[in-house]
C-alpha cells in the first residue's frame, strides 16, 4: 500500500493467510509507516510520524458474522511549531516524552534569512489491543438493495503504553425494500475515544471529523465541530452521524453501475474532554463543544453514484437545514452545497 499526497505519506506492507487452520481463521501481518502534516486538508500545521507493526486474526462465526482480534505496537513522534494550534501544542507538552527544540536562525546570504523558531516535540510508544465484530447480510457489496451490515470495533492502549486511551466505533447500514424497486437505506455511525491513566486527552490523530460527502452533505468537508485557535477544524472525541436515503429505481441496464437517491443527513462531532480550552472567533471568549441535540447539523438533497473504472463517482447537491450563521463569538458553519468525491458506494 503506497499513498503519497500533499498532507500525508503512508507506506504499508501486509500479508494475509486466509486459512491459518482448518476452521477458516485468517491471519494478517502488517507493517506501516505514516508521515502526516495535516489530518484533514483544512487543519492547522501538525506533524505526526509513526511506525507500527501488527498481527490480526479474523475468525468466522457464521456465514454472515465474524470476529477480529489484533495486537499492534506503534512508535509515534509529534511535532508542533508556531503554525500549530494552541490545542495541539497543549497535548504535545503534556503527554509522552516532551522536549523543546530550538531551531536557530539560518542565514543563506544576500538577504535570504530564515528566522529561528521553537518546536515542541513528543515521542511515545503505544501497544493496542483491537477487538472487532461484524455482521453483513447484504445481497451484494456494491449497490446492495437488501440486507444489513453492523460493525463494532474496540481499541485499547495497554497499561504499559506511554499514552493510554480507548476508542470505540460502531457502524450500521441497512436496506429496506418498500414496494417494487423502491428501497430505503439507513446508516449511522458513532465513534468515541477516551483518555486513560495519566494521559490528558486522546492523541489528536484519534480525533473524529464531520461534514462532507461521507457524513453530513451540504457542509464543507471536516469543517463541523470543534475549531482550534486559528479557526481551523480540530476534530473531537465524539462523533454522531446518521442518514436516510430513498433509492430511486434505476433502469435494469444501469442498475449494476448507477444509483440515484433523495437523502436526509444529520450529525456532528463534539469534544467531551475538559483538557482542551477552546476560544471563539474573537480569540478570547471560552466556548465549549459538548454534545447537544440542537448542535446536530441537518441537510437534505439529491445524490447520484456512478461506478466508473477509477472507482465510484459520487455527486450530491444538498440544502443545509439548520446552518449556524455565527454570533460574533462562535464560528459560523461553512456550507458547500454541491459536492463530488470518488470512493466507496453507500
Predicted regions and their residues:
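Solvent-exposed, glycine/polar-rich loop segments of beta-barrel outer-membrane systems
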Residues: 87-113, 198-223, 271-300
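Transmembrane beta-barrel strand/turn architecture of Gram-negative outer membrane proteins
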Residues: 49-61, 149-158, 163-196
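Short loop/turn motifs that connect adjacent beta-strands in outer-membrane beta-barrel proteins
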Residues: 19-26, 62-66, 80, 139-148, ...
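C-terminal structured "cap/appendage" subdomains that terminate the fold
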Residues: 276-331
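Gram-negative/organellar outer-membrane beta-barrel architecture
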Residues: 1-142, 148-149, 217-218, 222-224, ...
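Extracytoplasmic gating/loop element in the C-terminal half of outer-membrane beta-barrel translocons
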Residues: 180-277
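Outer-membrane beta-barrel architecture
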Residues: 14-16, 52-56, 132-134, 151-153, ...
Amino acid at each position: 500500500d503506497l499513498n503519497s499526497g500533499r498532507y500525508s505519506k503512508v507506506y504499508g506492507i501486509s500479508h494475509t493467510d486466509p486459512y491459518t487452520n482448518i476452521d477458516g481463521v485468517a491471519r494478517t501481518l502488517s507493517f506501516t509507516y505514516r508521515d502526516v502534516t495535516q489530518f484533514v486538508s483544512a487543519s492547522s500545521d501538525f506533524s505526526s510520524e509513526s511506525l507500527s507493526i501488527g498481527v490480526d486474526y479474523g475468525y468466522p462465526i457464521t456465514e454472515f458474522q465474524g470476529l477480529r482480534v489484533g495486537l499492534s505496537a506503534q512508535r509515534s513522534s509529534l511535532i508542533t511549531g508556531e503554525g500549530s494550534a494552541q490545542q495541539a501544542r497543549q497535548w504535545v507538552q503534556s503527554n509522552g516524552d516532551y522536549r523543546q527544540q530550538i531551531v536557530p536562525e539560518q542565514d543563506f546570504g544576500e538577504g535570504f534569512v530564515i528566522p529561528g523558531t521553537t518546536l515542541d516535540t513528543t515521542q511515545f510508544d503505544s501497544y493496542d489491543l483491537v477487538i472487532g465484530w461484524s455482521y453483513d447480510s447484504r445481497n451484494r457489496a456494491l449497490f446492495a438493495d437488501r440486507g444489513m451490515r453492523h460493525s463494532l470495533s474496540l481499541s485499547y492502549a495497554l497499561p504499559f503504553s506511554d499514552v493510554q486511551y480507548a476508542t470505540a466505533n460502531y457502524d450500521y447500514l441497512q436496506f429496506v425494500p418498500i414496494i417494487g424497486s423502491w428501497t430505503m437505506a439507513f446508516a449511522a455511525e458513532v465513534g468515541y475515544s477516551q483518555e486513560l491513566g495519566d494521559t490528558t486527552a486522546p492523541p489528536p490523530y484519534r480525533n473524529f471529523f464531520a461534514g462532507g460527502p461521507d457524513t453530513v452533505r451540504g457542509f464543507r468537508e471536516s469543517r463541523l465541530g470543534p475549531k482550534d485557535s486559528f479557526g481551523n477544524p480540530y476534530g473531537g472525541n465524539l462523533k454522531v452521524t446518521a442518514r436516510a436515503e430513498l433509492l430511486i429505481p434505476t433502469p435494469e441496464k444501469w442498475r449494476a453501475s448507477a444509483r440515484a437517491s433523495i437523502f436526509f443527513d444529520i450529525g456532528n462531532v463534539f469534544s467531551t474532554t475538559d483538557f482542551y480550552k477552546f476560544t471563539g472567533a474573537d480569540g478570547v471568549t471560552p466556548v465549549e463543544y459538548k454534545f447537544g441535540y440542537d448542535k446536530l447539523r441537518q441537510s437534505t438533497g439529491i445524490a447520484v453514484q456512478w461506478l466508473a473504472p477509477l472507482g465510484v463517482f459520487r455527486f450530491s447537491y444538498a440544502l443545509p437545514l439548520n446552518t449556524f450563521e455565527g454570533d460574533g463569538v462562535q464560528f459560523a458553519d461553512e456550507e458547500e452545497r454541491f459536492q463530488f468525491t470518488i470512493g466507496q458506494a453507500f
